[in-house]
Structures are given as C-alpha cells and as structure tokens.
Amino acid sequence: MTIALFPGSFDPITNGHIETAKKAAEIFEKVYLVAMTNTSKHYLFSPGERADFARDALKDVANIEVLEKPDEITVDLAHELNAKAIVRGVRNSADFRYEQEIAGINKRLAPDINTILLFSSPENSFVASSMIKELAKFDKDVSQFLPEKAAKALRRKLGNEYAE
C-alpha cells in the first residue's frame, strides 16, 4: 500500500488544504492528514480542534485518515506511519522555495522519504490560514475560503457579529 503523510498546521484548515488532501487521495492508497505544531507559530485552535475541522471536511474521502500529532518531527511521523511520501501544497513561488528547503532537510534526515509537491488551483492560490484569520479579525466573511465547520468555529472564536 502506498501511504502518504500530509502534515500541516491547518489553523484553520482552508479549501486549499482540502484540495491538496483530495489530490493526494487520488494518487496514494492511504493519506494521513496530520495536524501538527510548528514551534514558530501561534495557534488560534488546539490540535484537536484543527483535526476535527479536517475530519468533518474530509469525511467523504475514504482513504484519508486525520490525526493530531502536535509534538513530532515530520519525518519521524512518516516512518511511524509507514509513509513513503510527504505531501505538501504549493500556492506560489514563495511556497515552492520554502518547501524546497524543507524537503532538502527532510531528505537528509530520512533519505527513504520523498516530498511530493501538489500545486493549488488558481482559486486557492492566494488562500492562507494566516490571511483568513486576519480578515476574520476585522469581521469579514471568510466562509468562501474555509470548510463550513471551520468557518463557523472561527467566527465563534473571534466573536464576529455574523457568527451562527
């Protein structure tokens, strides 16, 4: 079975993340989407909440399993899950350069794990969780960029007037 790991912060998960996960599910027999922690980021949602939003959005994709592993190194987790590839989404050239650097480090740490880059569609090429959170803080409707459960939770968390 070909297994891939799709790690990320997913704070919150966006339609771009969902697109990448679904593309990976078409390529690999099993995809683990894992809510992880980047020590250089500050989170609005807990790993459990982030994983829950992903589970809800991807519940109809049989070969995707969502996990939360906030305290692991990506390549160690890939080995633990028997993944042969790490999947990453790329929106633009800045993402590409960043992912290229991370892929190089990961290859040094785990020569048996490959990084697969999947490019976003034009409609998701500008969507970033940090940007969406910023818009939501200013009471902008961000529901077009997020799965429904994540959008509602973001509105509630920030106390937006249009929260349901």
UniProtKB/Swiss-Prot annotation:
The keyword ATP-binding belongs to this UniProt entry's keyword annotation: yes
Binding site for substrate: S9, K41, T74, R88
Record's subunit section: Homohexamer.
Underlying gene: coaD
Pathway where this protein functions: Cofactor biosynthesis; coenzyme A biosynthesis; CoA from (R)-pantothenate: step 4/5
Binding site for ATP: S9, F10, H17, G89, V90, R91, E99, N124, S125, F126, V127, A128, S129, S130
Cell compartment(s), UniProt: Cytoplasm
Top-rank taxon: Bacteria
GO cellular component, one term: cytoplasm
Site residues, Transition state stabilizer: H17
Gene3D superfamilies the record matches: HUPs
Molecular function terms, GO-annotated: ATP binding; pantetheine-phosphate adenylyltransferase activity
Chief place where the protein resides: cytoplasm
NCBIfam families given in the database record: coaD_prev_kdtB (TIGR01510), cyt_tran_rel (TIGR00125)
Function: Reversibly transfers an adenylyl group from ATP to 4'-phosphopantetheine, yielding dephospho-CoA (dPCoA) and pyrophosphate.
UniProt protein name: Phosphopantetheine adenylyltransferase
Cofactor section: Mg(2+)
EC number: 2.7.7.3
Catalytic activity as recorded in UniProt: (R)-4'-phosphopantetheine + ATP + H(+) = 3'-dephospho-CoA + diphosphate
Stated family: Belongs to the bacterial CoaD family.
Pfam families: CTP_transf_like (PF01467)
